[in-house]
Amino acid sequence: MKIKTRFAPSPTGYLHVGGARTALYSWLFSRHLGGEFVLRIEDTDLERSTQEAIDAIMDGMNWLNLDWDEGPYFQTKRFDRYNAVIDQMLDAGTAYRCYCSKERLEALREAQMANGEKPRYDGHCRDSQCTHGADEPSVVRFRNPQEGSVIFDDKIRGPIEFSNQELDDLIIRRTDGSPTYNFCVVIDDWDMEITHVIRGEDHINNTPRQINILKALGAPVPEYAHVSMILGDDGKKLSKRHGAVGVMQYRDDGYLPEALLNYLVRLGWSHGDQEIFSIEEMTQLFTLDAVSKSASAFNTEKLQWLNHHYINSLPPEQVAVHLSWHVEQLGIDTRNGPELVEIVKLLGERCKTLKEMAESCRYFYEEFDAFDVDAAKKHLRPVARQPLEAVKVKLAAITEWTTENVHNAIQGTADELGVGMGKVGMPLRVAVTGVGQSPGMDVTVHAIGQARTLARIDKALAFISEREAQQ
């Protein structure tokens, strides 16, 4: 049997982390077993579905490198197919027209709730012989079995049973002629030959209804696996107030797709005590029986830890491609400065995100307007004039601009003055970067370049002179 899974988001908002994890699990399951992965856009909610949301879903999937073998399919383009099946069901008696007014249904609901009953349709039109005008508005309902149970073996949770008496007759076509979500899903899974439906636990209650429709159509029933929800650190369902945002916001905030994928796969799935997984390892190891039934709590610090790991473990050339986007967003012109690969090597250990790295690399490419106040107050004092003037002479004398020669110039200055490296290095750091923290001075000065370094030392010396004049 060819394994076939699907990811079927509704385009009513961005692709959030819960949806991305579901997509990842479905993708991994199919890839692990050599199957196919389908992308389907469930856009039957015409009022809430937007092109912007569709674009956000596609962008998120592409950024995460979760490729699909079929699709994207759009439910709104398949209405003729859905309605054709509904008409067949009406002819076969597995569906019927319901003419109950909104007022009657609302009164029924209120009465049931007043009696402590679960609100459900009472089957008023199910076996009715009453006649109605051809133009009288009606919905179409599925004739759900009234006896027995629906039992399915959830591949994460085990056997789940629903009594058919608890299920009312589901509306499958609205008065405006549009098919409903639960029905469209069934026909899509049937037509697309989906073998395994992996989705969030909020769909568990939809499953028995969908199984009954499939059986009424004589269609094969796929396997189902329902993934537990993601919680915030306060134990409540993850939402915007926890910082939960769309997948592309994580891109904007400087996270690598490899880090987010690694984090999401571990948010409910495990393989021993292993924390770090490449996409190849995930594909090789992923199974549904290792997915937890319990909810998982989202931990931003853990994601940052993973991101820092991948910034420093992936090939610098690969990280630099992602960094270039962030640098462009800040309007930094990198043509007059080191290659971004060098920035990744220099700043990787110091930065948890690429956004932080982009913001920290400005001094390699741009002149700064002012020195950091605290750093200048501490290190650009009159006592720093001598080491700055001395190191400038040695740096200016370098004919081959290498990291080693830069290091020797700084070390040689300290040795000649009989002071520690910090007495030379710290004023030099503030002079050439404008801030009090940076990578080692030899690699930093080398990357900034000889001419720019000398000019910045002159600027720092002028700053010291102005400071002396004001005292």
Curated annotation (Swiss-Prot):
Known function: Catalyzes the attachment of glutamate to tRNA(Glu) in a two-step reaction: glutamate is first activated by ATP to form Glu-AMP and then transferred to the acceptor end of tRNA(Glu).
Cofactors required: Zn(2+)
Main location: cytoplasm
Localisation per UniProt entry: Cytoplasm
Gene3D superfamilies in the record: 1.10.10.350, HUPs
Catalytic activity: tRNA(Glu) + L-glutamate + ATP = L-glutamyl-tRNA(Glu) + AMP + diphosphate
GO CC annotations on file: cytosol
Assembly and oligomerization: Monomer.
Keywords, alphabetical: Aminoacyl-tRNA synthetase, ATP-binding, Cytoplasm, Ligase, Metal-binding, Nucleotide-binding, Protein biosynthesis, Zinc
Protein name: Glutamate--tRNA ligase
Organism whose genome encodes this protein: Yersinia pseudotuberculosis serotype O:1b (strain IP 31758)
Cofactor binding notes: Binds 1 zinc ion per subunit.
SUPFAM superfamilies reported in the protein's UniProt record: An anticodon-binding domain of class I aminoacyl-tRNA synthetases (SSF48163), Nucleotidylyl transferase (SSF52374)
Pfam family membership, one: tRNA-synt_1c
Transmembrane intervals: none
Binding residues annotated for ATP, in chain numbering: 240
InterPro entries (UniProt xref): aa-tRNA-synth_I_cd-bd, aa-tRNA-synth_I_codon-bd_sub2, aa-tRNA-synth_I_CS, aa_tRNA-synth_I_cd-bd_sf, Glu-tRNA-ligase_bac/mito, Glu/Gln-tRNA-synth, Glu/Gln-tRNA-synth_Ib_cat-dom, GluQ/Sye
Family of this protein: Belongs to the class-I aminoacyl-tRNA synthetase family. Glutamate--tRNA ligase type 1 subfamily.
E.C. no: 6.1.1.17
PROSITE patterns, alphabetized: AA_TRNA_LIGASE_I (PS00178)
UniProt record, GO biological process: glutamyl-tRNA aminoacylation
UniProt short sequence motif 'HIGH' region, positions renumbered to this chain: 9-19
Binding site for Zn(2+): 98, 100, 125, 127
An example Gene Ontology molecular-function term: zinc ion binding
UniProt motif 'KMSKS' region: location: 237-241
